[in-house]
């Protein structure tokens, strides 16, 4: 690369996408700077999203497990923890993650610059530093990995102390008895699980007709039933007309005429890209209505020297995929093309209580495609390992082609689902006839394990053939 610029590449953002790009670039010998607007590296994933919410979920699920276990619990006195106590656990995990990721940059001699970046021209950035000064930086190429933030409608007062989004909920200081959650997407469902697990009343407002409609319908129905059984009130096909804040809580007026009152509101309906402060108009780039950028298969924007990865390009908006996108973009940036590509079937992990995970096609998709598939199921309650640890709620479902035995989709509902799914994913990715449900019958599993669910499901499915 020519060395007439300060850097070969500047990466804007240090979340999973930015980290993947930065590490990929420095490993190829590029001079790289990473710009991070906040004091610590890691981005929204580490500080407000994936890591803290999953740490919260883990703490709450352990409390539920303790209270439901007859060996350890005294049913005259349930174990309880305050939201602040559980947040302390999340803070400890965040600190560990931050130190680890900071070490990645230091060991690889990748410069971290703190401040807000904005484009001046095609190869120049202005960096607004925390001390009020402004630095000018130049680079031959750029990677935009600035992430996303919760969408804020203009008619909702997010400055009110009882109205939260999925970022600010982590700074909640009071103990709510009743929570309204508007938006029943992944974030809304995960927090519904967390609050209900803390014995908080939850009203979950869904703007659609069922939960997480992109899932296999049985998985969606399982979550709905589990929420209903645990006391979460789900209100489908509802939209708010206005949100009224008061000293002791929030009143939500729905377009259907209903009124709901709770101690606080978590607004979790949509996200928008963090592109509004980048002055993209100065380099001729435009975003869509959600602040997202369009890219090609190598993550190039309409400006060939500017790449974008992660939440800022939309689907799939997963930390795991963002890291791979950054790595692929780094390869394309240095070599002009990328030999690596994002896998076709990206696994989905949803950290409700219990978890949901899936990879590949759903039953609804296969039916619409007129694919002759069969189903193999394993109920967790029939597995020795699940009985030992008390994980009786859950199921593993394998969808496979009736004739070729090729695995077409795997769906799991239950504790550890996000871990269990990867066993099946590994077989699905095999080439040359290696992707077959018969693998699970012909291999030997440790016993007792949750992985054994694959053998049970495979036998169940193969026994349906005639």
UniProtKB/Swiss-Prot annotation:
A Pfam family the protein falls into: Pyr_redox_dim
GO cellular component, one term: cytosol
Catalytic function, reaction form: NAD(+) + NADPH = NADH + NADP(+)
Gene Ontology biological process terms, A to Z: 2-oxoglutarate metabolic process; NADP metabolic process
Coiled-coil regions listed in the entry: none
Co-factor remark: Binds 1 FAD per subunit.
Chief subcellular location: cytoplasm
GO molecular function: dihydrolipoyl dehydrogenase (NADH) activity; flavin adenine dinucleotide binding; NAD(P)+ transhydrogenase (Si-specific) activity
Subcellular location: Cytoplasm
EC number: 1.6.1.1
Keyword entries, A-Z: Cytoplasm, FAD, Flavoprotein, NAD, NADP, Oxidoreductase
Listed cofactors: FAD
UniProt binding sites for FAD: 36-45
PANTHER family associated with the record: DISULFIDE OXIDOREDUCTASE (PTHR22912), SOLUBLE PYRIDINE NUCLEOTIDE TRANSHYDROGENASE (PTHR22912:SF93)
NCBIfam families, A to Z: PRK05249.1
Family: Belongs to the class-I pyridine nucleotide-disulfide oxidoreductase family.
Role played: Conversion of NADPH, generated by peripheral catabolic pathways, to NADH, which can enter the respiratory chain for energy generation.
Record text on subunit structure and interactions: Homooligomer; probable homooctamer.
Protein name as it appears in the record: Soluble pyridine nucleotide transhydrogenase
């Amino acid at each position: 690369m020519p060395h007439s610029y300060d850097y070969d590449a500047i990466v804007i953002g240090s979340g999973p996408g930015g980290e993947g790009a930065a590490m990929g670039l420095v490993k190829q010998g590029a001079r790289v700077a990473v710009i991070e607007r906040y004091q610590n590296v890691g981005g929204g994933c580490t500080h407000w999203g994936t890591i803290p919410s999953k740490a919260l979920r883990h703490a709450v699920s352990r409390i539920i497990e303790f209270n439901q276990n007859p060996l350890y619990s005294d049913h005259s006195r349930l174990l309880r923890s305050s939201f602040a106590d559980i947040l302390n656990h999340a803070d400890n995990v965040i600190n560990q993650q931050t130190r680890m990721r900071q070490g990645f940059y230091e060991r690889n001699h990748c410069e971290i610059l703190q401040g807000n970046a904005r484009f001046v021209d095609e190869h120049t950035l202005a960096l607004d530093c925390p001390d009020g000064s402004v630095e000018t930086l130049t680079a031959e190429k750029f990677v935009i990995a600035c992430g996303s933030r919760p969408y804020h409608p203009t008619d909702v007062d997010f400055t009110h102390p009882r109205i939260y989004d999925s970022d600010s909920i982590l700074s909640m200081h009071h103990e709510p008895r009743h929570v309204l959650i508007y938006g029943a997407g992944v974030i809304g469902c995960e927090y519904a699980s967390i609050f209900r697990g803390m014995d908080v009343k939850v009203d979950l407002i869904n703007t659609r007709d069922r939960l997480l409609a992109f899932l296999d319908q049985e998985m969606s129905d399982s979550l709905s039933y589990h929420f209903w059984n645990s006391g979460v009130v789900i209100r489908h096909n509802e939209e708010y007309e206005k949100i009224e804040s008061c000293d002791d809580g929030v009143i939500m007026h729905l377009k259907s005429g209903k009124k709901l009152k709770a101690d606080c509101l978590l607004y979790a309906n949509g996200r928008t890209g963090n592109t509004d402060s980048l002055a993209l108009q100065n380099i001729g780039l435009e975003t869509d209505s959600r602040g997202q950028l369009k890219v090609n298969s190598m993550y190039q924007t309409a400006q060939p020297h500017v790449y974008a990865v992660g939440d800022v390009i939309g689907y799939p908006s997963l930390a795991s995929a963002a890291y791979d996108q950054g790595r692929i973009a780094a390869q394309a940036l240095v070599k002009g093309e990328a030999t690596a590509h994002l896998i076709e079937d990206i696994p989905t992990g949803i950290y409700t209580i219990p978890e949901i995970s899936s990879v590949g096609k759903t039953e609804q998709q296969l039916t619409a495609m007129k694919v002759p598939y069969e189903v193999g199921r394993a109920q967790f309650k029939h597995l020795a390992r699940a009985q030992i640890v008390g994980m009786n709620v859950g199921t593993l479902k394998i969808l496979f082609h009736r004739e070729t035995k090729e695995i077409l989709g795997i769906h799991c509902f239950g504790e550890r689902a996000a871990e269990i799914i990867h066993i099946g994913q590994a077989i699905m990715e095999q080439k040359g006839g290696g992707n077959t449900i018969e693998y699970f019958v012909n291999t030997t599993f440790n016993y007792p394990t949750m992985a054994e669910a694959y053998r049970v499901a495979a036998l169940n499915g193969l026994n349906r053939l005639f």
